């Protein structure tokens, strides 16, 4: 079992180092960050005697970690829009002594000093450099380097896929917008229905108020007529009472006249009796 584990550990670096140019000894590294975009810049750290000590790549607008070692002495190369690395060459001894990068626009940049055994790597006319891997001796230098290439036509396929995805997302967004718009229209319809119901309620309330007002006015008119009738009835009764009182008074006065006549008759009788006595 221990033997199998040992073989597996040894096989890992060996397999990974098969495509590495230079010395196949040291600590393996792979420059990650390609998910952030295409290769847009290269920064190489150098030793005092211009050996390749460390490397850092820029993907899109992001710089990767430094693989190998940093140093105060470094050089960088930035790619223009639409520019890609199409070829890499270099020289090596125990360490990498130089690296040269050629672009599709014909520009060439060299890091370090060319000395030692040379090597050359190209993905072909229709490929460009994506990222690099390699081996390094910690604190000393880079021992070897490998290169990952990508077919330029894959970008068109990826762009088409991205465009289709964008179109699908756009369609989904449009459908969602239409759905939201329909919901808004339904909501507006509900508001309109609520407003109509509110107007109907207001009209009903106004009609009820008018009916109540008419009823109140009718009641007031009836009350006034009743009061008027009561007042006229009371006046007639008072007049009748006054007439009866006057009539009674007149009757009493007649009686008094009769009494006066009776008194006169009595006086006349007395006079006649006196005359008879004198005779």
Swiss-Prot record:
InterPro entries: Jacalin-like_lectin_dom, Jacalin-like_lectin_dom_sf, PolyBind_ProtTraffic. The keyword Glycoprotein applies. Residues 160-177, 185-279 have a biased composition (Acidic residues). Glycans are attached at residue 62. Prostate. SMART domains: Jacalin. It holds the Pfam family Jacalin. Coiled coil: none annotated. To mouse SBP. PANTHER family: OS11G0524900 PROTEIN (PTHR33589), ZYMOGEN GRANULE PROTEIN 16 HOMOLOG B (PTHR33589:SF1). This is Prostatic spermine-binding protein. It comes from Rattus norvegicus.
């Amino acid at each position: 079992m221990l033997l199998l584990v040992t073989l597996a550990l040894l096989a890992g670096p060996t397999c990974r180092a098969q495509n590495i140019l230079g010395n196949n000894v040291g600590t393996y590294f792979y420059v990650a960050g390609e998910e952030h975009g295409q290769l847009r810049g290269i920064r190489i750290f150098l030793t005092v005697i211009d050996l390749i000590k460390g490397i850092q790549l820029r993907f899109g607008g992001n710089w990767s970690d430094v693989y190998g070692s940093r140093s105060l002495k470094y050089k960088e190369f930035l790619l223009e829009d639409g520019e890609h690395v199409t070829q890499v060459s270099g020289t090596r001894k125990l360490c990498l002594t130089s690296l040269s990068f050629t672009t599709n626009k014909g520009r060439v940049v060299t890091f370090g000093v060319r000395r030692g055994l040379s090597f050359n790597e190209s993905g072909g006319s229709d490929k460009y450099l994506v990222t690099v891997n390699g081996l390094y001796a910690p604190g000393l230098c880079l021992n070897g380097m490998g290169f990952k290439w990508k077919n330029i036509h894959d970008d068109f396929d990826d762009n088409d896929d991205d465009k289709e995805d964008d179109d699908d997302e756009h369609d989904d967004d449009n459908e969602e917008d239409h759905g939201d718009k329909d919901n808004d229209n339904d909501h507006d319809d509900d508001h309109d229905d609520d407003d109509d119901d509110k107007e109907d309620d207001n009209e009903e309330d106004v009609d009820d108020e008018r009916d109540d007002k008419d009823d109140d006015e009718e009641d007031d008119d009836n009350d006034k007529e009743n009061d008027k009738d009561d007042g006229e009835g009371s006046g007639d009764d008072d007049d009748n009472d006054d007439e009866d009182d006057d009539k009674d008074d007149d009757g009493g006065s007649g009686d008094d006249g009769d009494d006066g006549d009776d008194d006169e008759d009595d006086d006349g009788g007395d006079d006649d009796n006196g005359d008879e006595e004198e005779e």
